[in-house]
Amino acid sequence: MLFAEIFGYRIPMKAVILAGGRGTRLSEETQFKPKPLVEACGHPLIWHIMQNYALYGITDFVVLAGYKGQQIREYFANFWLNQADVTFDLSTPNREIHKVRSLPWKVTVIDTGVDTNTGGRLGRLKNSITEDFLLTYGDGVSDVNIQELISAHNRSENIATLTAIQPQARFGALKLNGNQVENFQEKPDGEGAWVNGGFLVLSPRIFSYLIEDKTSLEIDALPRIASEGKLGVYKHSGFWQPVDTIRDLQRLEEEIAKGSLPWV
């Protein structure tokens, strides 16, 4: 059962997924497919990401595609065809898909170009999003509590609220002051440093910081917003696994196999 059904709420918010990068560090897989379609225990990363959102009633998705984006379109176009028994009537164009459990999801796939940076990809939505929305990356899986993330954002007047986590010391760190991000650090101080976990709530005001295709959300926009005191934080202590390497993928599959993630 959905958490949204248990607690009696539905969140009419879009979830935007950045899915256009080349994923070069995972070239064993990404030479053949975009990274969001790399499979973990029989389902692509993007499926796992969307399932966690759906637990909280988030079912309106916008996928910002780029590298091998046609494969993402084909995945959703054939979503049920590849997951159920099917009967083809070769005398007609008809087909019958059997025993399908419907999903109340709406998925929009937008081509944002192969070499466009993250801020440029997001900037494509400037004229179509007028309310706060969710954003994440198509290569990181987490059981982050979306309701709590949204609530943290709504309690503030911030332009953006990001999810901070404490992984092993391999990522650039955040300098926090209470529930605000002060700045970004290239190298963390060691174990226990907070980093950007890649699950965000954004105000439409973000679009004024996304000037051109080469704008980086992480390097250009978010540090500027932090310097203005408008970048909030929600601290997540649960599961979080980015997938940049084969070993990362193995770690994710090990966690899925335990049955500890709420959507599997």
Residue ranges of each PLM-predicted region?
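Catalytic-core segments of class I nucleotidyltransferases/pyrophosphorylases
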Residues: K14, F133-L134, V141-N154, Q166-A169, ...
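Conserved beta-loop-beta/alpha segment of the NTase-like Rossmann-fold superfamily
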Residues: Q71-G178
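N-terminal glycine-rich phosphate-binding loop and ensuing alpha1 helix
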Residues: I6-F79, V109
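Structural beta-sheet core signal
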Residues: I17, V63, L135, A160-T163, ...
